[in-house]
Swiss-Prot record:
Protein known as: Nucleoside diphosphate kinase
Compartment(s) where it occurs, according to its Swiss-Prot or TrEMBL record: Cytoplasm
UniProt keyword annotations, A-Z: ATP-binding, Cytoplasm, Kinase, Magnesium, Metal-binding, Nucleotide metabolism, Nucleotide-binding, Phosphoprotein, Transferase
EC main group: transferase
Pfam family membership, one: NDK
Lineage: Archaea, Methanobacteriati, Methanobacteriota, Stenosarchaea group, Halobacteria
Keyword NADP included in the entry's annotation: no
Gene3D superfamilies documented for this protein: Nucleoside diphosphate kinase-like domain (3.30.70.141)
Species the sequence originates in: Haloquadratum walsbyi (strain DSM 16790 / HBSQ001)
GO cellular component terms, semicolon-separated: cytoplasm
Catalytic activity from the UniProt record: a 2'-deoxyribonucleoside 5'-diphosphate + ATP = a 2'-deoxyribonucleoside 5'-triphosphate + ADP; a ribonucleoside 5'-diphosphate + ATP = a ribonucleoside 5'-triphosphate + ADP
Amino acid sequence: MSEEAPVHERTFVMVKPDGVQRGLIGEIISRFEDRGLTLVGGKFTRLDTEVARDHYGEHKDKPFFDDLVSFITAGPVFAMVWEGADATRQVRSMVGETDPAESAPGTIRGDYGLDLGRNVIHASDHEDEGANEREIQLFFDESELYTYERIDDPWLYE
C-alpha cells in the first residue's frame, strides 16, 4: 500500500485580541510545537482598519463584517507562521470549528473559545489554496520568516 507523502508547507495563524488579553499565546504555541510544527515567524501587531478589512475581505458583504473589523482592531494580535507536513490541515484540526460551541473538547476553540465572536484564534482556510500565501504576505515580509531544522525533525519526517 503506497501512501502519498504529506505536503511540507507554511500556514498562517493569528491569536486574536481576546486570546492575547487572556494570556493564551504560550499555550497555543506549545500545542502547535508539541504537534511537531515549527514556528518560523511570530510578532505582536495591532491591525489598522485597512489591514483588517483586507484580511477579512471575503466577509465584506456579511452583516457581521463591521463588528468583526472593530473587534480585531480593538487590541493587539499575535501573528504567526507555522511550517510542517500538512501544516494547514493540522492547524485547522487543532483549532476546531469557528463556533466554539460546535468545537470538540481538546481543540483550541473547544477549550478556550467563549462564543462565535470571541473564539481566540484565526487560522488559514485549508480549502482556499491562496489563503496561506495571501495572509502570510499581508502580515510578514519574507525577511521575517526563518526556516530551520528542529532537532526532532528526523523523528517526525522520513
